């Protein structure tokens, strides 16, 4: 994407991945009500401009709706899967204060994020074999230096079970 428009750095992958708010799984919808004019809503405008793209990138399952100039005071409303609503007043707050507050009340804590990251890394460990959906490799024959799969290249006679059974039977006689 070309670096054109207002503050194009907001669309870079590095900037988007720097966001640190990952919502809990119960958050389904986030609405932002703010005004485009006035001093009291300056933090909300900066929050929408700088931080909403990061939140969208980190939380693709959350629907985010923006309402401009429909309210006297800026606020955020979160709809949870249990039917509850969480209302956050953002009047006179800066965009950083808003991010910290939202992270504190509806964000996952560091321990949960660390545990989820560990589980993802464990699933993608190169020693695991299985369907491509879950593992990096389907068969041991895909590892360099291993014996190729008998489905692709036939095994030498000495390694087959029939040959070894015949050898044992001949030794017993």
UniProtKB/Swiss-Prot annotation:
Gene3D superfamilies attached to this UniProt entry: Glutaredoxin
Cellular component aspect of the GO annotation: mitochondrial inner membrane; mitochondrial small ribosomal subunit; mitochondrion
Subcellular location: Mitochondrion
MF terms (GO), sorted A to Z: structural constituent of ribosome
Pfam families: L51_S25_CI-B8 (PF05047)
Listed SUPFAM superfamilies: Thioredoxin-like
GO BP terms, alphabetized: mitochondrial translation
Keywords for the protein's UniProt record, in alphabetical order: Mitochondrion, Ribonucleoprotein, Ribosomal protein
Family: Belongs to the mitochondrion-specific ribosomal protein mS25 family.
Subunit structure and binding partners: Component of the mitochondrial ribosome small subunit (28S) which comprises a 12S rRNA and about 30 distinct proteins.
Protein name: Small ribosomal subunit protein mS25
């Amino acid at each position: 994407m070309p670096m054109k428009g207002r503050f194009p750095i907001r669309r870079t992958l590095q900037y988007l991945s720097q966001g640190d708010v990952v919502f809990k799984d119960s958050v389904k919808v986030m609405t932002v009500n703010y005004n485009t004019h006035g001093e009291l809503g300056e933090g909300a405008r900066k929050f929408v401009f700088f931080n909403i793209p990061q939140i969208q990138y980190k939380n693709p399952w959350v629907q985010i709706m923006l309402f401009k100039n429909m309210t006297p005071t800026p606020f955020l409303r979160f709809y949870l899967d249990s039917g509850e609503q969480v209302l956050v007043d953002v009047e006179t707050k800066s965009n950083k204060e808003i991010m910290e507050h939202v992270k504190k009340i509806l964000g996952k804590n560091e321990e949960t994020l660390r545990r989820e990251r560990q589980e993802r890394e464990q699933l993608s460990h190169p020693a695991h074999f299985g369907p491509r959906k879950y593992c990096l490799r389907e068969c041991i024959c895909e590892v360099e230096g291993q014996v190729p799969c008998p489905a692709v290249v036939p095994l030498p006679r000495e390694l087959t079970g029939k040959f070894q059974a015949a050898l044992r039977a001949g030794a017993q006689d």
